[in-house]
UniProtKB/Swiss-Prot annotation:
Protein name: F420-dependent glucose-6-phosphate dehydrogenase
Organism: Mycobacterium leprae (strain Br4923)
UniProt entry keywords in alphabetical sequence: Carbohydrate metabolism, Oxidoreductase
A Pfam family hit: Bac_luciferase
Catalyzed reactions per annotation: oxidized coenzyme F420-(gamma-L-Glu)(n) + D-glucose 6-phosphate + H(+) = 6-phospho-D-glucono-1,5-lactone + reduced coenzyme F420-(gamma-L-Glu)(n)
Residues annotated as binding coenzyme F420-(gamma-Glu)n: D39, T76, T107, G108, N112, G177, G178, E180, V181
EC primary class: oxidoreductase
Keyword field contains Oxidoreductase: yes
Active-site residues (renumbered): H40 (proton donor), E109 (proton acceptor)
Binding site for substrate: T195, K198, K259, R283
EC numbers on record: 1.1.98.2
Record family assignment: Belongs to the F420-dependent glucose-6-phosphate dehydrogenase family.
Length: 336
């Protein structure tokens, strides 16, 4: 099995830019192996929300750290961005921070793309997935060097070159919520990304088998694929604090169809805040006992995931990092 890694999710929707950078730096100081960041033009909620630019955060944290792996979880390189420009940006970061950068990609959400000018009805999954695959092909062709002509269904290049590229390009991690994209991740991604709290059968019967199938079709060793999961966990020795911390992140407990189709953070906030706290908690591991926390997290390792990235919902992130380093990290490391 691939190496066990522990990571920190920097919540760009919750914290202002300077604080978000300081948290990324603190993640390395507290022993995390990676720090990932979301890429939102608009946050999940209007009141108290933030949405700093992910690539600015990565470079700022990269300059102040030495070893931690940095990446997006995730970015959509297909609508408000031109994938060639994203390829250039990540190639530059790959040169600045060798072997420390990855590009995590997904198919996109209306919340971020409609406000920035996407015209017409929000595309169905089939088109969004096709755009994603094409953008990955385009970026990799650019990273191979030489001049590139590319005539795709959605994107075109004419004599394009990226002049500063790290050897081998940049690892691409592909986010999947279902088996079709998971199979693609196994076939074409250096990494695979999913999120926690969706029921054992999704991971054991759909996602992980699909990743393995995709790897087999491509003749790849599945152990070479970094299998990342964002674990939504509210850990605090105070049970009431652990529960209250999750309220800010109620939008994550909405159905996938709602999250993908709502394009206004004010509406998103209104719909999410109508959810009872008990329903919000179903998406989270809400715990006060470290052994219980590790037992519930450990099931994901048993199911085949090796890179555990922790999304803590509370406003006091330094407290979480301190508690994680003291109470959870030593226990979790033993799982590997």
């Amino acid at each position: 099995m691939a190496e066990l890694r522990l990571g920190y999710k920097a919540s760009a929707e919750q914290f202002a830019p300077r604080e978000l950078v300081e948290l990324g730096v603190a993640a390395e100081a507290h022993g995390m192996d990676s720090a990932t960041v979301s890429d939102h033009f608009q946050p999940w909620r209007h009141q108290g929300g933030h949405a700093s630019f992910s690539l600015s955060w990565m470079t700022a944290v990269g300059e102040r750290t030495n070893r931690i792996l940095l990446g997006t979880s995730v970015l959509t390189p297909t609508f408000r961005y031109n994938p060639a420009v994203i390829g250039q940006a990540f190639a530059t970061m790959g040169c600045l921070y060798p072997n420390r950068v990855f590009l995590g990609v997904g198919t996109g959400e209306a919340l971020n793309e409609v406000a920035t000018g996407y015209q017409g009805a929000w595309p169905e999954f089939k088109e969004r997935f096709a755009r994603l695959r094409e953008s990955v092909r385009l970026m990799r062709e650019l990273w191979r060097g030489d001049r590139v002509d590319f005539d795709g269904d959605y994107y075109q290049l004419k004599g394009a070159s990226i002049y500063d590229v790290p050897e081998g390009g940049v690892p691409i991690y592909i986010a999947a919520g279902g088996p079709e994209v998971a199979k693609y991740a196994g076939r074409a991604g250096e990494g695979f990304v999913c999120t926690s709290g969706k029921g054992e059968e999704l991971y054991t019967e759909k996602l992980i088998p699909a990743v393995l199938e995709g790897a087999a079709v491509a003749g790849r060793d599945a152990d070479d694929i970094d299998k990342m999961i964002e674990i939504k966990m509210s850990y605090d020795p105070d049970p009431e604090q652990a529960l209250s911390n999750i309220r800010f992140w109620a939008p994550l407990s909405l159905a996938a169809e709602q999250k993908h189709s709502i394009d206004d953070p004010i509406e998103m906030e209104k719909v999410a805040d109508a959810l009872p706290i008990e329903q919000v908690a179903k998406r989270w591991i809400v715990v006060s006992d470290p052994d219980e926390a590790v037992a519930r997290v450990g099931q994901y390792v048993t199911w085949g995931l090796n890179h555990l990235v922790f999304h803590a919902p509370g406003h006091n992130q330094r407290r979480f990092l301190e508690l994680f380093e003291k109470d959870l990290a030593p226990r979790l490391r033993r799982l590997g």
